[in-house]
Amino acid sequence: MGKSKSATKVVAEIKATKPLKKGKREPEDDIDTKVSLKKQKKDVIAAVQKEKAVKKVPKKVESSDDSDSESEEEEKAKKVPAKKAASSSDESSDDSSSDDEPAPKKAVAATNGTVAKKSKDDSSSSDDDSSDEEVAVTKKPAAAAKNGSVKAKKESSSEDDSSSEDEPAKKPAAKIAKPAAKDSSSSDDDSDEDSEDEKPATKKAAPAAAKAASSSDSSDEDSDEESEDEKPAQKKADTKASKKSSSDESSESEEDESEDEEETPKKKSSDVEMVDAEKSSAKQPKTPSTPAAGGSKTLFAANLSFNIERADVENFFKEAGEVVDVRFSTNRDDGSFRGFGHVEFASSEEAQKALEFHGRPLLGREIRLDIAQERGERGERPAFTPQSGNFRSGGDGGDEKKIFVKGFDASLSEDDIKNTLREHFSSCGEIKNVSVPIDRDTGNSKGIAYLEFSEGKEKALELNGSDMGGGFYLVVDEPRPRGDSSGGGGFGRGNGRFGSGGGRGRDGGRGRFGSGGGRGRDGGRGRFGSGGGRGSDRGRGRPSFTPQGKKTTFGDE
């Protein structure tokens, strides 16, 4: 009963010290008041502490009763620095409480709890010790469920102690929990000699509990920080996942685009193939694989005006078809036009249609047309455009119905030559056309002619070497390019400017553009001849642009 009376006295004295809460803003006055109250009420505190220690820590009481005087001496030696620590902790707690007053509502509850706790430290530090132990024990479950820990503390301790210690445990920060641990150490120092036996055990338990509490708080804070860190980490993970998904989508879209791109080149290649097919189909009618008879695309055109131009020819044949090329024969001496040439069309059908224009007037002259041998025919020989005395109507003359004739009397007029040739070859078959090239400079025949038969060409070729009378022997052959013609043969006059045989004249067999050797004075040395020598055939071939051999001048020139 005595203990209960002392307990009631403690409650009355605590009420007397409550007004000290208002003057708590002056830390120095509070410290002096605390010291005086502690000295006067050592007995009461000792009784209360023993009662609570017996109830709550029986094992520790037994160990403290058995402790010797050495622990008491050690405890006395530790009292002075502990008091200093308590005063400093009180000052710091006061400052923190005064600083925390304008804080948010969450911090207000914590500051109120610390004020109540400090007032209780002034009145009964032993009560704080026991309550500190409870706080230290209950801090770990408080991190999981704070409201449950508050109720447990109220049941285990007195109302005053629970109000002072449970409120800081309700929503504590790490800074509030640490001063509570320091207050518990200061309350241990204020106890009397009777309670000193218990303190070695309780002090060891209290700092450990405080450390555990601080560690639990720090672990809670760490866990909170980790949870907060985990949130941005989750956000980052979410963003990464979204980025990954977006990257996957982008990769899929890129793959789709790549597939589309792969499909488009295929389409392009097919388009190219279609275009090529269209081109080839467009070209097929222009180049038939089986050309018609006389399927050359080139026409020989003679009796042309000397003032003619390419545009005149294109306009003349525009009704027949497309004119691809026009080649006029020119004189190699001065480059003057010789009055004939070749016209190439886009197709053989167009050339055949243009052949119907034979005899029509072109710039005041009736044009004479004939089919010329196409390029590449007869052993890949090109179409022949005559440039000299070896001129043959129709160019290469590869048509099956044409023959080449020379060796006749070239001094005759064009009409006389035609009539003579018609009479000579009349027995072979029907003659469709006779062409006698004329030198426009002199107006004389070039000594050659072309005959076209409807039929009977083979019989006409049999007349090669036949005598036309007057000592003229004909040379009859297939139409050939100039390079394949040979000089010599016969006893023609041979002294003409364009003599083509091997006669005995001054320039026999050579002439200005002669192609064969002979006995002439300058045999084989014509102005554009490429060979020489008595009786030599080295002069064959088309005349070269660069004169070769010895240049001779004559007095009559």
UniProtKB/Swiss-Prot annotation:
SUPFAM superfamilies xrefs: RNA-binding domain, RBD (SSF54928)
Region: Disordered, residue numbers: 1-297, 376-398, 474-557
Tissue expr: Expressed in roots, leaves, shoots and flowers.
Cross-referenced CDD domains: RRM1_NUCLs, RRM2_NUCLs
Biased composition (Low complexity): 174-184, 203-217
Domain of life: Eukaryota
GO cellular component, one term: nucleolus
Protein name per its UniProtKB record: Nucleolin 1
Source organism of this protein record: Arabidopsis thaliana (Mouse-ear cress)
